[in-house]
Amino acid sequence: VNQKELEPFSYGLTNTFLKNITELPKSIRVLKKTMHDLDKQLMGRFDILLTPVTSIITPEIGYLSPLLSSKEIMKRASMYSPFAGMQNVSGVPALALPMGKDSRGMPVGLQFAAGMGQDALLLELAYEIEAAQPWTHLYEV
C-alpha cells in the first residue's frame, strides 16, 4: 500500500490490520462469544437494550478528520461511539434512531439492540416510533 495514495487514517488502519491479520479470526471469535454470552444474560431478561448512539453531543466538524493519525481517530471514535462497535462486529441486530435535538439543534440518537435473530422486533419498534414521533429534518429538504 502506497502511503501517498491514502489518507493518514486509511493508511494507518491498513498497516494495523496487516500487522495483526493472524490475530483477527481469534479476536472476532472472542467478540462473538462475548456478545453471545451477553445476549443470553441480558436478552433473556430484556427485549431491547437501549444505549445512546454517542457518548458526547455532536462534535465540531473535523473531530474525526481522516487527516488525523489512525491512532488518534481510533481513540476519538472509541470515546465518541463506544456502544455501536460490539453490534457492528458481532452481528447482534441494532439500529440507531434520531430521538430529539440537543440545545444546538443537533440530532441526539438512541441505539436499540435486540437479541440475536430478533431483527423483526427492532424493525417493528422502529415503525412504531416513527408513527408516534416522526422525525423532522433539521433543514428544508
Label for each model-derived stretch:
Residues 77-90:
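Hydrophobic alpha-helical segments in the ANL/AMP-binding
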Residues 42-43, 87:
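A short, aliphatic-rich alpha-helical micro-motif
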Residues 59-80:
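Short, surface-exposed loop/helix-turn segments at secondary-structure junctions
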Residues 1-40, 52, 56, 93, ...:
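Short helix-loop capping/hinge segments that flank enzyme active sites or metal/cofactor-binding pockets
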Residues 47-49:
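Conserved acidic residues
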Residues 25, 88-141:
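Structural helix-boundary/capping segments
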